[in-house]
Amino acid sequence: MAVSAALVLLGLLSLSGLDAIQRIPEVQVYSRHPPEDGKPNYLNCYVYGFHPPQIEIDLLKNGEKIKSEQSDLSFSKDWSFYLLSHAEFTPNSKDQYSCRVNHVTLTQPKIVKWDRDL
């Protein structure tokens, strides 16, 4: 009985230690198709390599939040997490699009601009 209790306690302690590992999110912003002004497309924000899993991701048009959808939270072999946030958009040369990520590892939100030339 004591051995079982010790094993359970050891397992719980090792799981709680996962929260102590913090990893800063990496961010990539790209369009699904090559951009053409006035042609509908999808803007993607891929956020990966972060831990713990609690994170806020917003897609922005000229600094204002736009309606977006998000994939289910997934994790890699190293227990870091990744998500894809995406939104329909129609690019033009006047508007600026970006992705804003807020995570416990960041002192301020990380904002990555979409570069239409990539």
Curated annotation (Swiss-Prot):
Gene Ontology CC terms, in alphabetical order: extracellular region; MHC class I protein complex
Record keywords: Disulfide bond, Immunity, Immunoglobulin domain, MHC I, Secreted, Signal
Signal sequence segment: 1-20
Quaternary structure and partners: Heterodimer of an alpha chain and a beta chain. Beta-2-microglobulin is the beta-chain of major histocompatibility complex class I molecules.
Keyword rRNA-binding set for record: no
Gene Ontology terms: biological process: antigen processing and presentation of peptide antigen via MHC class I; immune response
Function in brief: Component of the class I major histocompatibility complex (MHC). Involved in the presentation of peptide antigens to the immune system.
Bilayer-spanning residue ranges: none
Subcellular location, record wording: Secreted
SMART domains on file: IGc1
Gene (UniProt): B2M
Major location category of this protein: secreted
Family: Belongs to the beta-2-microglobulin family.
Organism superkingdom: Eukaryota
Disulphide connectivity of cysteines: 45-99
Pfam families: C1-set (PF07654)
Domain Ig-like C1-type: 25-112
Protein name: Beta-2-microglobulin
Cross-referenced InterPro entries: B2Microglobulin (IPR015707), Ig-like_dom (IPR007110), Ig-like_dom_sf (IPR036179), Ig-like_fold (IPR013783), Ig/MHC_CS (IPR003006), Ig_C1-set (IPR003597), MHC/Immunoglobulin (IPR050160)
